[in-house]
From Swiss-Prot:
UniProt name for this protein: D-alanine--D-alanine ligase
Cofactor binding remark: Binds 2 magnesium or manganese ions per subunit.
SUPFAM superfamilies documented for this protein: Glutathione synthetase ATP-binding domain-like, PreATP-grasp domain
Domain ATP-grasp as annotated: residue spans: 101-301
Amino acid sequence: MSKHVAVLMGGWSSEREISLRSGNACAEALEGEGYRVTRVNVGPDIATVLTELRPDAALNALHGPAGEDGTIQGLLEILKIPYTHSGVLASALAMHKERAKTVMRAAGVSVPEGRVVNRHDAAKSHPLTPPYVVKPIAEGSSMGVIIVRDERSHPPQILASDEWVYGEEVLAETYVAGRELTCAVLGDRALGVTEIKPVSGEWYDFDAKYAGGGSIHVLPADLKLNIYQRVQELALTAHQALGCRGVSRADLRYDDTPGGTGALVVLEVNTQPGMTQTSLVPEIAAHAGQSFGELVRWMVEDASLNR
């Protein structure tokens, strides 16, 4: 009898629609691989749903708070349902950008300088010397990210308004100029490096990530061999330092601008990267010779407890 897999998707975070795309793509691929699949649109009754469903494994296609911060992982541990991706601790650590940086820095991974500040204080005066970036402590998909270019710019006033829905504390980081890179990690190996070039704008914001034609993916990234290998080393080290399991994706910046610093830094590790057939991790896996179906099958067969 084929293995029964519950594909968890949706949820109630700001990344719900992205999660639905990932989940449906994974479910379709798993069905093509011969698994018995139940699509689960996650809501507040998820504990009851999973208790009644009793799948052999859960493929976690959730994004954002409650889906990749250790919450759903803890529930799956309680229910004794093997699941994909990272466990409770690694998920919670990686989701909290500042604590993740502390762990990565201790492991020798270069990260941007920065500090946590109250959002109202950051709206009154510059928390760092511009250029700098302000971002929510625990959001994905570039939600709420603001770049302040120079000292003549006013601090971002939206931080003090009711429109800001990402919590009272924000992370202010030194802006690193240069190229946007990302590296997929699968288990104990780095699969490859992609350079992301936004078609409009200067950085990889939400629209560049998810709008059709919003960015160009250069795979493999056109880098000197030593830099390419260093990106892979940093991604794998960050994955291991945070205790990640299964699939993760490290996002980096490389400053090779004229007169630049040459800095190569890890911005964050995504423990629940996008999983449509055109998402970054599946693209990198395909370039490494692994089809989308083979990728999701590997993830399900890797599912376990105590991750």
